[in-house]
């Protein structure tokens, strides 16, 4: 069985400081007589003044401020997002349910992982006990998996709603099942990290690490699988779906579909897709340096001896953790409903003014879900009957309108002004499943 030092030197677990971060502050290099190419170290109870990686007080203060700001903004912002959706019936939609799941995962990651990991990286000593050691190795992968697959579920839902709107949408029960399945799969993926977590009490300090039965190669293989499953694969899926959706929404105007109601729907769909693309791109950018760091330090282990490696780790980890705080800011900037919700949440601030329009944005009544489903079905039937209107002698125009049905329910009603009530119902129901679109 590989030694703890060997495992740590090979590749630390997700959210763990690099070997240099553990070695630099509380240890000194081992004698150079060993021919092993991997970094090795001998723990010592106190850091000596000659340690080149010891953080000066001003650097510790700056890093502490940076990490503290991320945690404060991420936890507060995501809790407000959860409150906005759960406290207002109009916001309880399929897509917003996934946004709540995303916000919960991000808030938990920031609150339970960021500061603890920062302290461990900075001090090189584990202060939090064996149980939290297991949790600390286990939860980061779980939370990141839940976050990115919530985004993936939104991307697939948007794809189905825009590309094939006549197919049934996810019900509230189905949405809960999808969210539950995401967390179950996340737990299964992260379980080995919990199973192999160890605490080692040494003279002068305590270490928390993951000790794999077959050593560093098994550890590296596992983390490459994790990177593929929680980064590469979901980003590929979202890239494909949003590309197709973007081509559909921005590919040009549909001839004949020029009524105001349809144009409003199209504009709203473009806004929400743009917002979600920004969320996904932000996540990808924030986590990319972190993944690159671990891959490079695992392959080129001599990098762990570089005197600036601790700074590189702290910077890449801060950027990854900062991904948890950007989503609430994006929602507030790009969506009217969420902006109104944030104003209500911070109305106690003297410079925040909540207008009557903001109140109306969140309090406007909506149809009951069952009634929505029935109206949606009736509207589809009415729309189809309009397409095959026997009074229309222009077969080419009928054929065009039939194609428009698959593009958007609202376009059917606009292109055939059969009745005002049909147009109103169709346009409302086509966007009722996603309040983000309504408020964009």
UniProtKB/Swiss-Prot annotation:
<keyword id="KW-0449">Lipoprotein</keyword>
<dbReference type="GO" id="GO:0007166">
    <property type="term" value="P:cell surface receptor signaling pathway"/>
</dbReference>
<dbReference type="GO" id="GO:1902093">
    <property type="term" value="P:positive regulation of flagellated sperm motility"/>
</dbReference>
<keyword id="KW-0297">G-protein coupled receptor</keyword>
<keyword id="KW-0812">Transmembrane</keyword>
<dbReference type="Pfam" id="PF00001">
    <property type="entry name" value="7tm_1"/>
</dbReference>
<dbReference type="GO" id="GO:0007186">
    <property type="term" value="P:G protein-coupled receptor signaling pathway"/>
</dbReference>
<feature type="glycosylation site" description="N-linked (GlcNAc...) asparagine">
    <location>
        <position position="7"/>
    </location>
</feature>
<feature type="topological domain" description="Extracellular">
    <location>
        <begin position="198"/>
        <end position="220"/>
    </location>
</feature>
<dbReference type="InterPro" id="IPR017452">
    <property type="entry name" value="GPCR_Rhodpsn_7TM"/>
</dbReference>
<keyword id="KW-1015">Disulfide bond</keyword>
<feature type="topological domain" description="Cytoplasmic">
    <location>
        <begin position="157"/>
        <end position="176"/>
    </location>
</feature>
<feature type="transmembrane region" description="Helical; Name=2">
    <location>
        <begin position="93"/>
        <end position="114"/>
    </location>
</feature>
<feature type="topological domain" description="Cytoplasmic">
    <location>
        <begin position="83"/>
        <end position="92"/>
    </location>
</feature>
<feature type="transmembrane region" description="Helical; Name=6">
    <location>
        <begin position="275"/>
        <end position="296"/>
    </location>
</feature>
<feature type="disulfide bond">
    <location>
        <begin position="133"/>
        <end position="208"/>
    </location>
</feature>
<comment type="function">
    <text>This is a receptor for the tachykinin neuropeptide neuromedin-K (neurokinin B). It is associated with G proteins that activate a phosphatidylinositol-calcium second messenger system.</text>
</comment>
<keyword id="KW-0675">Receptor</keyword>
<feature type="compositionally biased region" description="Pro residues">
    <location>
        <begin position="32"/>
        <end position="46"/>
    </location>
</feature>
<feature type="topological domain" description="Extracellular">
    <location>
        <begin position="115"/>
        <end position="134"/>
    </location>
</feature>
<feature type="compositionally biased region" description="Low complexity">
    <location>
        <begin position="420"/>
        <end position="434"/>
    </location>
</feature>
<feature type="lipid moiety-binding region" description="S-palmitoyl cysteine">
    <location>
        <position position="349"/>
    </location>
</feature>
<comment type="similarity">
    <text>Belongs to the G-protein coupled receptor 1 family.</text>
</comment>
<feature type="topological domain" description="Cytoplasmic">
    <location>
        <begin position="246"/>
        <end position="274"/>
    </location>
</feature>
<dbReference type="GO" id="GO:0004888">
    <property type="term" value="F:transmembrane signaling receptor activity"/>
</dbReference>
<feature type="transmembrane region" description="Helical; Name=4">
    <location>
        <begin position="177"/>
        <end position="197"/>
    </location>
</feature>
<dbReference type="InterPro" id="IPR000276">
    <property type="entry name" value="GPCR_Rhodpsn"/>
</dbReference>
<dbReference type="GO" id="GO:0097225">
    <property type="term" value="C:sperm midpiece"/>
</dbReference>
<dbReference type="InterPro" id="IPR001681">
    <property type="entry name" value="Neurokn_rcpt"/>
</dbReference>
<feature type="transmembrane region" description="Helical; Name=5">
    <location>
        <begin position="221"/>
        <end position="245"/>
    </location>
</feature>
<feature type="region of interest" description="Disordered">
    <location>
        <begin position="22"/>
        <end position="46"/>
    </location>
</feature>
<keyword id="KW-0472">Membrane</keyword>
<feature type="topological domain" description="Cytoplasmic">
    <location>
        <begin position="335"/>
        <end position="440"/>
    </location>
</feature>
<keyword id="KW-1003">Cell membrane</keyword>
<feature type="region of interest" description="Disordered">
    <location>
        <begin position="390"/>
        <end position="440"/>
    </location>
</feature>
<feature type="transmembrane region" description="Helical; Name=7">
    <location>
        <begin position="310"/>
        <end position="334"/>
    </location>
</feature>
<protein>
    <recommendedName>
        <fullName>Neuromedin-K receptor</fullName>
    </recommendedName>
</protein>
<feature type="transmembrane region" description="Helical; Name=3">
    <location>
        <begin position="135"/>
        <end position="156"/>
    </location>
</feature>
<dbReference type="InterPro" id="IPR001013">
    <property type="entry name" value="NK3_rcpt"/>
</dbReference>
<keyword id="KW-0564">Palmitate</keyword>
<dbReference type="GO" id="GO:0005886">
    <property type="term" value="C:plasma membrane"/>
</dbReference>
<keyword id="KW-0325">Glycoprotein</keyword>
């Amino acid at each position: 069985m590989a030694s703890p030092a060997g495992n740590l030197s090979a590749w630390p677990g997700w959210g763990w400081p690099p070997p240099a971060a553990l070695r630099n502050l509380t240890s000194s290099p081992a004698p150079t007589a060993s021919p092993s190419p991997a970094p090795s170290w001998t723990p010592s109870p106190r850091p000596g003044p000659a340690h080149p990686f010891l953080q000066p007080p001003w650097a510790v203060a700056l890093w502490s401020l940076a990490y503290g700001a991320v945690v404060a903004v991420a936890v507060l912002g995501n809790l407000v997002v959860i409150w906005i959706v759960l406290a207002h019936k109009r916001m309880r939609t399929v897509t917003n349910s996934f946004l709540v799941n995303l916000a919960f995962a991000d808030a938990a990651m920031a609150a339970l992982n960021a500061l603890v990991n920062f302290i461990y990286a900075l001090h090189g000593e584990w202060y939090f006990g064996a149980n939290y050691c297991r949790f600390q190795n286990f939860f980061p992968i779980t939370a990141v998996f839940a976050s990115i697959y919530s985004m993936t579920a939104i991307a697939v839902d948007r794809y189905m709603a825009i590309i094939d709107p006549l197919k049934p949408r996810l019900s509230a029960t189905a949405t809960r099942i999808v969210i539950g399945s995401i967390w179950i799969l996340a737990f299964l993926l992260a379980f080995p990290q919990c199973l192999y977590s160890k605490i080692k009490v040494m003279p002068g300090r305590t270490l928390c690490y993951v000790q794999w039965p077959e050593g560093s190669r098994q550890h590296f293989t596992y983390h490459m699988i994790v990177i593929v499953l929680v980064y590469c694969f979901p980003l590929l899926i979202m890239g494909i779906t949003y590309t197709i959706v973007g081509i559909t929404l921005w590919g040009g105007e549909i001839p004949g579909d020029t009524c105001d109601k349809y144009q409003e729907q199209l504009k709203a769909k473009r806004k929400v897709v743009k917002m979600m693309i920004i969320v996904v791109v932000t996540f990808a950018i924030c986590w990319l340096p972190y993944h690159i760091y671990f891959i490079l330090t695992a392959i080129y282990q001599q990098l762990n001896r570089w005197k600036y490696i601790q700074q590189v780790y702290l910077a890449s980890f801060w950027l990854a953790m900062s991904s948890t705080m950007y989503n609430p800011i994006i929602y507030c900037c790009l969506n009217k409903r969420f902006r109104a919700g944030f104003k209500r949440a911070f109305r106690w601030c003297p410079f925040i003014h909540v207008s009557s329009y903001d109140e109306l944005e969140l309090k406007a009544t909506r149809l009951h879900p069952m009634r929505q489903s029935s109206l949606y079905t009736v509207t589809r039937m009415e729309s189809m009957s309009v397409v095959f209107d026997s009074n229309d002698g222009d077969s080419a125009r009928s054929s065009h309108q039939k194609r428009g049905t698959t593009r958007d329910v609202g376009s059917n009603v606009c292109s055939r002004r059969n009745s005002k009530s049909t147009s109103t119902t169709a346009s409302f129901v086509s966007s009722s499943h996603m309040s983000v679109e309504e408020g964009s």
